[in-house]
Amino acid sequence: MFFDSRQAADWLPQRWSIQVEKHSADIGIFGGSGFYKFFDDCEEVSVETPYGPPSDKVFIGTLGGKKVAFLPRHGRHHQHPPHKINYRANVWAMKHLGVSRIISPCAAGSLQKHVAPGSFVVCDQFVDRTSGRIDTFYDGPISTHVSAADPYCGQLRQLAVKAGKDCGITMHEKGTVVVIQGPRFSSKAESKWFGAQGWEVINMTQYPEGHLSKELEMCVVNVALITDYDSGLHADVNPVSHAEVVEVFTKNLDKLQKMLIKLIEHIPAERNECQCARTLASARI
């Protein structure tokens, strides 16, 4: 199927009323390729956006008793490196399909000794160390200043922590993710400096993905699966490699999938316990 949402571009910076009844989904997941294989009644949907093509087709199916849209942020063949992902197109596609909650799992490195590989961190803050990424939908003519003080939905974070604990996973209930530009990994000096600031994890995709989702008044939660200690943490830690990240992530993928399914099962239909749906109420001049 194919949807043309280019004609809807003029809603910015106005309120939107985009509804796609036939293929609507309640929850969206940005993640690695392959997760859609666990869907019931999976269907591939093409979405054209005002910002160009998303990373891939969107997979829509049933998971945890709810309609879920899944988009592999790097593409199904991992062809889009983190600094080249069309984040605006990806987020727009989810909004266009009626998604109101975004779950954003990712692989991440640990910057602190107590955050061990194999554990999960439900981040509550980010630090943006990227450069040149387009990170807003609001380029005028109406000035719109969306707060990033609390970048992740408090209600979804609580539900994610509970879901992980119910699955027997070691969960860190909060943490700061420092987002680097990529595709290179950090130098030891950079990694050591990040850790000295007290930041817990390091990743390449959480910004601007999460903030753009918030700009469109969607709830967003990050679940970081820790794959390695970053290079500046221990003197005897070998520099991180992509192969190592993939190996550890794959070993823990079953835990992540079980946790996400349980999280989805417990997400309520109504958004009554957060302010995410009213993000723009105080953002405009």
Predicted regions and their residues:
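Active-site rim beta-loop-alpha module in soluble metabolic enzymes
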Residues: 151-196
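Metabolite-binding pocket within alpha/beta catalytic cores that recognizes anionic/polar moieties
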Residues: 2-4, 8-149
